[in-house]
Amino acid sequence: MAENTPKPAAGTAPAKPKPAAPGAAKPAAPKAARPGAAKPAAKPAAPRAAAPSGVYKKPPVDRPDPNPFKDSKRDAVAGWFQERFYVLNPIIDYLKHKEVPKHALSFWYYFGGLGLFFFVIQILTGLLLLQYYKPTETDAFASFLFIQGEVPFGWLLRQIHAWSANLMIMMLFIHMFSTFFMKSYRKPRELMWVSGFVLLLLSLGFGFTGYLLPWNELAFFATQVGTEVPKVAPGGAFLVEILRGGPEVGGETLTRMFSLHVVLLPGLVMLVLAAHLTLVQILGTSAPIGYKEAGLIKGYDKFFPTFLAKDGIGWLIGFALLIYLAVMFPWEIGVKANPLSPAPLGIKPEWYFWAQFQLLKDFKFEGGELLAIILFTIGGVVWLLVPFIDRQASEEKKSPIFTIFGILVLAFLLINTYRVYAEYSMLK
């Protein structure tokens, strides 16, 4: 059927489309391309403006917020500190999630904190005593008399310092043996044991160097006897001369003991203590072997604030005991040291050296002192390396041989300490 639309004649140009009338509707937009149809080519990106010749333009860097905790809800004071010390927030959060196991032997954990508490008391009272003490042969004893009689509450300050030193060492011994018998030194806590034992040795060094500072008769002759012992060992005479500042105990010895007591030893203790506490926080507190498998763990205390609050209660009890001992059982000043006078009866070191002192007395035969020093050295090295030797404990197995070894060491210390106490009590 023929169409009615006329075709253009051959040779004639096609008719141009008529322009749309004003107000007429615009032609409809082209429909979206069907799926699979070829997409039109993307327009090329506009070229970046060239930087001035010879000038490097640093590209922008997306930096994280330096303080992600600044918008957290805290009171004004806490928020102020949090905004300035925000790097400590992860540490605080870690301590909040740290837990300590609860069981029948958990109370032994608190003796380490008591030792730290008495060490802080030592620092505070020592700094106050340092304001009046004069470390010279002529003025040392007189300065103690001045502190005792003229300084307001000076007598109490001196007694607190003396008693806190003894209580600190006692707490450290208890902490060490409780750690040993619970096998808390086992893997991965070997370095906690090593650093703790080094802290005990440094604390004994505090006791030895501080004993001479009052410059009284007992302290003078006890130091003379104590510094004689290393002479029998190879190189011991040279070491003793350095410690004494000369061939005999004198004013130079007092000065050197003072510098060791207030400068060198505190610095070493702070370094080792920081390492020890860091390891304790990282590795945590271990329960005795087999307690977890036997269901003897009663639960867990949050280190902060639960365990720390219980620690604080122990500190308050320890402080009350310290004040009671300082007031009711004061340490005597004694008589000023006279190097030319004969040694009085009853010369002995402090109680924490009595076991070694008794062994030296028992080994009075030729070469006995050297043998005693060798035994002390070997015993100390073995005690230090127990975590690395006791492989059964590292495998969470009981090690009765090391338990017996610890009982023998404890018995040696207690029996010989009592022997010295009994002997010298009869001389009074």
UniProtKB/Swiss-Prot annotation:
Region Disordered: start-end pairs: 1-72
InterPro entries: Cyt_b/b6_C (IPR005798), Cyt_b/b6_C_sf (IPR036150), Cyt_b/b6_N (IPR005797), Cytb/b6-like_sf (IPR027387), Di-haem_cyt_TM (IPR016174)
Residues reported to bind heme b b566: 175, 276
GO biological process: respiratory electron transport chain
Known cofactor(s): heme b
Residue sites binding heme b b562 per the record: 161, 261
GO molecular function, one term: electron transfer activity
Keyword Heme: yes
Pfam families: Cytochrom_B_C, Cytochrome_B
A GO cellular component annotation in the UniProt record: plasma membrane
PROSITE patterns registered for this protein in UniProt: CYTB_CTER, CYTB_NTER
Membrane topology qualifier: Multi-pass membrane protein
Keyword Cytoplasm belongs to the record: no
UniProt keywords, alphabetically: Cell inner membrane, Cell membrane, Electron transport, Heme, Iron, Membrane, Metal-binding, Respiratory chain, Transmembrane, Transmembrane helix, Transport
Subcellular location(s) of the protein: Cell inner membrane
Superkingdom of origin organism: Bacteria
Note describing how the cofactor binds: Binds 2 heme b groups non-covalently.
Compositional bias ranges of the Low complexity kind: 1-15, 21-52
Transmembrane segments annotated in the record for this chain: 110-130, 162-182, 193-213, 260-280, 312-331, 369-389, 401-421
Main subcellular localisation: membrane
Function comment: Component of the green S-bacteria bc complex, which consists of the Rieske protein and cytochrome b subunit but appears to lack a cytochrome c1-equivalent. This complex has a comparatively low redox potential.
Family: Belongs to the cytochrome b family.
Other noteworthy facts: Heme 1 (or BL or b562) is low-potential and absorbs at about 562 nm, and heme 2 (or BH or b566) is high-potential and absorbs at about 566 nm.
Protein name: Cytochrome bc complex cytochrome b subunit
Record organism: Chlorobaculum thiosulfatiphilum (Chlorobium limicola f.sp. thiosulfatophilum)
